[in-house]
Each structure stands twice: as C-alpha cells, then as structure tokens.
C-alpha cells in the first residue's frame, strides 16, 4: 500500500547547531513521498489500533501526555519506545522531530537499548542552544523556536537486515543460494526505486549496480553476496533504509522553553545589605539600589547569570518582627521583607528605603549590561498594613470575633503576615496579580521566584502563569515549595519552570545517588530541580559543622549535580552560625541588615571555587541537560562519582563532551576509593587508557575501566575530569 509522510532534506541528520549566537533555523522542504513497499493493508496506525509494526510505551510521557514534557531550547534529551513485529521479524525505528509549525527538523535512527524488551532509544535536540537574553535584539529568533515541538516514533520492517542475516548463514553452508541471492538482488532494486529512502542519484546507482552484480553466476556465492554485504550498503542502511510496513505513533508534545529555563546559575542577595555600613555611632546604615550594584558585580565576577532579590516592597509596621523573628521589634529594626505592605503601598510599590521605581529600573538596566537577569521574589501575602486589607477585605479570612487570621504553621505563628483567602474572589485576585507581575516585567524583571506557592491553589498559579506568559513568553517562574512530592509535581505541571528541592538534606552517598538520578531522570522532563546548598531559611547541620570543606563539597555537588543551581550570598564567607531553635542562620538576614567584610572571601577560597565551577559549566555542554547523568560505582561510601555526557552532534565543536565528577563527602577526613567507568557504555576507549584533565586543578591522569582516587578536605575535595578523547573538532 502507499504510506505518506514528510521527509527531511538530509535523513537522519538534525538541523545545524551552534552554541552562542542563534540564527534562524533552517527547516527542510516538506514534500510527500510514496513508499513503494509490498502491499500491507494495516501499515498505517490508526488511533486505538495497532499498525503493521507495533509501537508501545513512547517516552517520556507526563501523566499519559496530559501535560507536555519540557526541555530547554538546544538541550539534549532522550526518547524511547517499544517497537516490534510478530515472530522473529526484524524491525527498525526512527524518531521524527517537528517544530511548532509542523516542519520536520530531524529524522534520527533509533538504537536498540534492550533487545529483550524491544526497547529503542534516540537522542534529540529541539532548536539551537543559545545564551541570548530576552533583551538582546537577536532573541526574536530564539522566540520563534520556542513552544510545542512534537516527536513521533516510526517503526518499520527491516527487510534488508533480516535478509542479510539469513543470507550470510545460507551462503556459508550453501543452502538455497540462488533463491537467496535473487531475493537480495530484487530487494536492492526495489530499495533503489523507493522514494521513501530519499536516495540521491549516486546512492541509487550503487544499489542498482550491486543488484546486477549479485546475479553474475560466473562468481561464487560468497563473492556475489559481498555486493550486498559491505560498508557502503551498510551505511545506506543506517541513513537511508528501506522501510517496509511503515507505521507511525501519534505525536508526543515537548514544550521547548527559552535559555535558562533549565541551565542557570542563581545568586541571591538582599539589596538593603549591599553597601550597608556602621556609622560613627555604630548604627547600621542600609544599602539601596545604587549600592546594590556591588552585588551585581560580585555575581558577574563569580560567573552567575541570574540575580535573585527578596521582596523589595514596603514593609509593614504592625506586628513587625525583630531579630531572628522576635515578636517585638525595636525602633531601628527593618523588619522582614516578607511582611509586605504599608501605608506607602503594596506589591506594586518600591520600598522608599531602597529607592524609587526609576532607581530599580536603572538597577535592572545595569544588570542587563552585565548579562545578568533579575529575578524578583513574589510572596503572595500581606502585612496587616497592606492596602489590600482595607480595599479587599474579602480576600482575607476572618475569625469569629471579626479579626483577620494571621498565618500559622503550628507551633509557628506569623503575626506580621496575613495569608490570602482565594475562595471569595479568585478571578479578582488573579487579575491583580497579573497586573502587578506585568508592572515588574516592564521594569526589567524576567523571572519570578514565588514564595510558598504550595499554600495557594494550583489552579490559581496555572491561570496566572498562563496569562503572564501569553503576553511575556520569556518570563520564568521558580517555585519555592518544600512540600510533598505530589504538590511540587502539580506546580510544575501548572507552569513553574524550576523548583527548589530537598537537595540540602541529601548528604549521604545513597541519598545523593537516588536524588541525582531522580532529578536527572524522567522527573527532569517536568520538574527542574534547582540545587541550593543554603538559603536564608536553610542551614543544615552538615554545612554548619563541616566548615570550608563542607561548603566546597556542597558547591561542587550543586553546580554539577543539576543544570540549575544557586548560591545565597555570604556562602563565600562561611556564614554558618545556626539558630538554636531552627535549621537556619542566626542573625538572619530576613530580619536585619548585614554588614559584611568581603575582603575575607579571597582568603577563604570559596569565591574562587564558585567562579571555577561556573566557568566549567559555561565551557562544557555536558552540564546543560537534565537527561545525561550516569552514576559511577565507587567502593567507598564516602566517595560519590557520576558522569555527564553530551554527544558530539549536540556540541558546538562537534566533539563529545564527557565530564567525570568525583567528590569526597567527608568534610573531615581523607578518603580513597576505586571508581569503575563503563568505557563501552560511554563510548570511551576500551582497549587502552584515555586521558582525563581535572578542570579544577589542571592536573592530568590516565584512566580506564577501574581507577584510584584519593581526596582530602585540606587539599582537593573533588575531581572534575574532562575526558580528552582526541576527537578532532568540526570545521
């Protein structure tokens, strides 16, 4: 029968790529070709029915394709499916990638991952990797590549492969030779004339001449077989196969998001602490948006690309909290920026102590000049002084005595915060939040970090994010939701681009191995975990007690364990004094202004390490994907090792990028271990050693299958090896 489908100009080859600047991608011409295959009345797969080839379990699938899997533009990702036919019939499979306009951008042959399970896989890349920012003029071309891409799996009977398998056996024992060779000659002739194979004139000529030579009875059988069994024909079989019984799955949607949706490096600081100092009387003088430029410059110097600010709105006076959340605030206590709203304004107003809206716009402009995006904390809650309390009393819950209920998480009480009640005027609250977010976007904000979104209805966030991104598709959302996995997953489905996660509490080797695989496995298609060693709300015992070594260990794990990571400023200064009653810093910056001596950072060395880690990330494509991490076996429970690898067809220079990360988890003692590397699985040399170069120290070693490491907290807490394969870069 006739099977119709679209072809690319170069079958099996993805569109051309580059890493930094992005040009308009070239799409192949779309044409309809007729597959001249034997009559197979069920070759086309109808919805709910099996085709001639059976295709099952197409992955990734998020909630049975109710929600789209998500990847960053240019990010390497893997698709898989079970493809099979009856009996011992050989099959082949192809992954077909289509852009939002339906054009086929790549047709990639799939490889057998598990023959017993009929499982085939292929690695794909949607669009071209870019480092452009939303304000760059060229970003318009990036935007054209964003949106819903589609992947279909094509299965087909591998007639040539099956014939060749049997022909080798029969010719070797001289069984039914003439019928076998005649069938092969006819197969090559049909292959040469099949338009589905998309052969050029030279390739068709090769097949026809081979078919003719196979019928030369003056030659012995083995010589005749070689005309169909050689490297040239095998190469055509890989790139331009004869595909009988062609069957296609339905399209599976992948939502392709803009740069930094997956691969990002965050730096958090409080503007009021930047440039703060003690006056002659020992009184703290807070910083503002002018002095906070120093935070931008520090973030840039250390290699971060997103600066994240806590709420910058007016702070309430009623029930204002004192140091470390004390119930009674003194006259000079600045209060928590999360107690939002005063007589000066609410979420749409700049705190006058920080400056004006024009000052904030100038701050954002300076950030953009430094190639830094500005992320703003959006905490949807109010102080008792917020204008909404008077303007929209139905947005809050009242107690039987008529008073408004403040926030509680027993035994904790937050008298300075009123939570929102969404059940009386959901649409009105949505419209107001959309208005406010658009206001800050116009001022220069491109990302919102949402505080405690899990305490609000998921549908609310789904509506708000959809409305905001419809107008501003470049805007990203980070969910600060330390809660149950189902809720975090739901928030991701609702549109949150990234998520805070439980990385700070994953400290042992088993915990980390499980969490790394969870983050970089199927979950990475809908939930982008961002690894933060500490935050203003989190200071674990591991970091508290482990000193400089613990800070270094956690930084390496965060930077290389996830494509997205973040640092809360002060990490460089080992600020690790913990409150007695909470797992967070004492003298917490949420409640007071910090005056810091940044000159100590160079002496401690963490700042230099952060810079090195971000430099490694910027140079190595292997660090950019949530779908390329492999745990490596190590013999010591205090040593963890993993590899990240991106294939050469997805890198700027065409060379496969492989990183091997080895970390000592013990911040007190030297640890030694053997590390096993499955060289074959990673495509590394199997018969001889290969060279690895430590990206932190520059030292080089010869590695192979099993390797010895020794790491000490007073020397190197980690190795970050780049495998020097000797591949030549593309011209």
From Swiss-Prot:
The keyword Hydrolase does not apply. The record marks 537 as: Transition state stabilizer. GO terms for molecular function: hexosyltransferase activity; hydrolase activity, hydrolyzing O-glycosyl compounds. The active site is at residues 451, 480. Its EC number is 2.4.99.16. Keywords: Carbohydrate metabolism, Glycosyltransferase, Transferase. Belongs to the glycosyl hydrolase 13 family. GlgE subfamily. PANTHER family: ALPHA-1,4-GLUCAN:MALTOSE-1-PHOSPHATE MALTOSYLTRANSFERASE, GLYCOSYL HYDROLASE FAMILY 13 CATALYTIC DOMAIN-CONTAINING PROTEIN. This is Alpha-1,4-glucan:maltose-1-phosphate maltosyltransferase. It comes from Bifidobacterium animalis subsp. lactis (strain Bl-04 / DGCC2908 / RB 4825 / SD5219). The lineage of its organism: Bacteria, Bacillati, Actinomycetota, Actinomycetes, Bifidobacteriales.
